[in-house]
Amino acid sequence: MSLQVRILTPEQVFLNVSADEIILPTNTGQMGVLTNHTPLITAIDIGPMLVRSESTWQSMALLGGLALVKDNQVIILVNEAELGSDINAEEAETTFLAAKEALANSKTRKDQIENNLAFKRARVRYQVATLVK
């Protein structure tokens, strides 16, 4: 038996696959989900998600949302999602370094909040672009 994993964004069904294991970025840290997991609802943070089907891992960036786990089904509603294989690693690194510098040079509280969000988004894109090849 496997997990049925669906990732939904406002624009589309981003992913609909069977998986043996997933690792979710929750607000309290990374959480692994295997078959027959106890039912739960959890907040999804900006972070990398990993999906294992047989012996193959697939990485993706999730940009905040909710996940529901019940009866070997995982439904994830997120603002945005992007496959690691679709991200240009060099471009992601450049964006990450620029976001890191912008965060360090934030002058106002508003700039700090906006730059922190941009930094988290850039960091996760860079992580998943280089995580699993």
From Swiss-Prot:
Pfam short name (any one): ATP-synt_DE
GO CC, one annotated term: proton-transporting ATP synthase complex
Keywords from the named record: ATP synthesis, CF(1), Chloroplast, Hydrogen ion transport, Ion transport, Membrane, Plastid, Thylakoid, Transport
Principal cellular location given in the protein's record: plastid
Membrane disposition: Peripheral membrane protein
GO MF entries: ATP binding; proton-transporting ATP synthase activity, rotational mechanism
InterPro entries in UniProt: ATP_synth_F1_dsu/esu, ATP_synth_F1_dsu/esu_N, ATP_synth_F1_esu_C, ATPsynth_dsu/esu_N
UniProt cross-references to Gene3D superfamilies, sorted A to Z: 6.10.140.480, F0F1 ATP synthase delta/epsilon subunit, N-terminal
Subcellular location: Plastid, Chloroplast thylakoid membrane
Similarity comment: family membership: Belongs to the ATPase epsilon chain family.
Annotated NCBIfam families: ATP_synt_epsi
Subunit structure, interactors included: F-type ATPases have 2 components, CF(1) - the catalytic core - and CF(0) - the membrane proton channel. CF(1) has five subunits: alpha(3), beta(3), gamma(1), delta(1), epsilon(1). CF(0) has three main subunits: a, b and c.
Task of the protein: Produces ATP from ADP in the presence of a proton gradient across the membrane.
Protein name: ATP synthase epsilon chain, chloroplastic
Taxonomic source organism: Nephroselmis olivacea (Green alga)
